[in-house]
Regions:
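Cytosolic regulatory regions of ion transport systems
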Residues: 1-446
Length: 446
């Protein structure tokens, strides 16, 4: 593909790094250092110039398969989308935005934008489920099914047993899509034994997620629902998380040292949330019992700070603690410290864009476990040529993942179903390194 990326910051750099294999990638930015860094480290073309100036685009290929705008400015991203249409023929455009107003279908249609990403909004959505399933570390929802992918840490005294045996003890439909053990991620088969302290990625319907609690969590964990939450960080993500929690009936407080952020948060939340500036650090607030809360979220843009505050809150006995992860390099560390990790805005922008690029009209997919795992879905629609047939599963594919079929809110192992029926959903769990093989297999008989 011919790919143009407007913006050479952290998000643009990581997208270019991922796409440079088997694609022709050009990155545009007026920051000379950023362009130099990209040219020295990546096999892409860097253009140093003003993204808002049409002359910057002269000389690029007139046929562009994918245009991605990921600067920190909505206005720049939208303007670049207009400019590129006058310079080249563009098949697909993905634009990163901060203000959800610009993500409306009307604006997308007028500017010929294929898809928009609003990272602060998308990054806040897992909290809809983390309140209901407080024993889960993270949760992802999917098209075509009500099943969720939730990560749960097994308790210290968990009795090792095979996955197939364990699933038989759960009330409801559940499958295991991945395991992180001793800092390594892998996709298990049902014959794999699960061990204490494993971080398990369960694919399950809501009733099964509830029943998992008594089996996998510490005995002394309180069963009372989450009623209150403190969010440390009043920028856009903290505000979006607060909106989600308020809709769930949670009493929310937001803290920040920045008085201007507090003022803006208070205006946007319309007094539905207590927002206050504090000159104290979070450790002082926790140690002095300045608040009593069921849930603590460290939502600043500094991962080291978030990690520190999560550890302090954990020592104070707060039952649910979540740290926002802004830098991919800290993702594994946070999970290994048993911090419940939710993607921050920049990481969310990166993964959301990759997920959209690698999805199609046939399959959809999402990354998990810090990008080490991928779950790929294909629905069998009423007019699908797959109805009454079945994709053969060769060993070279089967060895690279775990495959299930969703049918009428039931989960079946792939090999147990003889033929596909209308509305079946084929689900494949795999390592990110094997995604291309699984994707190619699922694209058969479109």
């Amino acid at each position: 593909m011919q790919v143009i990326i407007a913006g050479a910051g952290r998000v643009g750099y990581n997208i270019a790094k991922h796409l440079m294999i088997n694609n022709s990638v050009t990155v545009i930015d007026q920051n000379e250092f950023a362009i130099q860094n990209i040219q020295e480290n990546l096999d892409v073309l860097g253009i140093c110039g003003n993204i808002e100036n049409p002359h910057t685009y002269f000389g690029i290929d007139p046929q562009v398969d994918l245009f991605i705008a990921v600067t920190d400015s909505d206005e720049v991203n939208l303007l670049s989308s207009l400019i590129i249409d006058n310079i080249a023929t563009v098949k697909r455009k993905i634009i990163r935005l901060k203000n959800s107003f610009f993500a409306s279908d009307l604006i997308k249609s007028k500017l010929n934008i294929s898809e928009t990403i609003v990272p602060s909004f998308e990054a806040a959505q897992p909290f809809k489920y983390l309140v209901d399933f407080s024993h889960a570390h993270n949760a992802k929802a999917f098209e075509h099914t009500k099943a969720l992918l939730v990560s749960i840490r097994l308790k210290d005294d968990f009795t090792p047993r095979m996955i197939s045996t364990f699933i038989g003890e759960i009330s409801g439909e559940v499958s295991v899509g991945g395991i992180e053990r001793n800092k390594k991620f892998f996709v298990p088969k049902p014959s794999e034994t699960i061990l204490p302290n494993d971080l398990i990625y369960f694919f399950a319907f809501p009733n099964a997620i509830v029943s998992l609690r008594s089996v996998v969590c510490e005995i002394n964990e309180p069963l009372s629902p989450i009623k209150s939450c403190v969010i440390f960080g009043a920028d856009s993500l903290g505000v979006e998380i607060a909106k989600v929690l308020v809709k769930k009936g949670i009493e929310v407080q937001i803290m920040d040292k920045n008085i201007e952020l507090c003022r803006k948060a208070n205006i946007e939340l319309k007094d539905k949330v207590t927002v206050f500036k504090t000159t104290y650090d979070a450790d002082h607030i926790v140690n002095k019992n300045r608040f009593d809360t069921d849930m603590f979220i460290a939502a600043t843009k500094n991962d080291e700070y978030n990690i520190t505050k999560c550890i302090e809150a954990k020592q104070k006995g707060i039952k649910k603690i979540v740290g926002i992860n802004n830098d991919i390099a800290y993702s594994s560390l946070m999970r290994n410290l048993n911090i419940e990790v939710v993607r921050g805005e920049k990481i969310n922008a990166y993964y959301s864009i990759l997920e959209r690029i690698e999805s199609s009209s046939i399959i959809s997919q999402k990354k998990f476990c810090g990008g080490e795992g991928a779950v790929v879905l294909r629905k069998v629609f009423y007019n699908s040529p797959l109805i009454g047939t079945k994709l053969s599963l060769p060993d070279k594919v089967d060895d690279r993942g775990h495959f299930i079929i969703l049918r009428n809110n039931d989960i079946f192992e792939y090999q147990s179903i003889s033929t596909f029926e209308k509305d079946d959903v084929i689900v494949a769990f795999t390592k990110e390194s094997d995604f291309e093989i699984i994707s190619k297999w699922l694209h058969q008989n479109p």
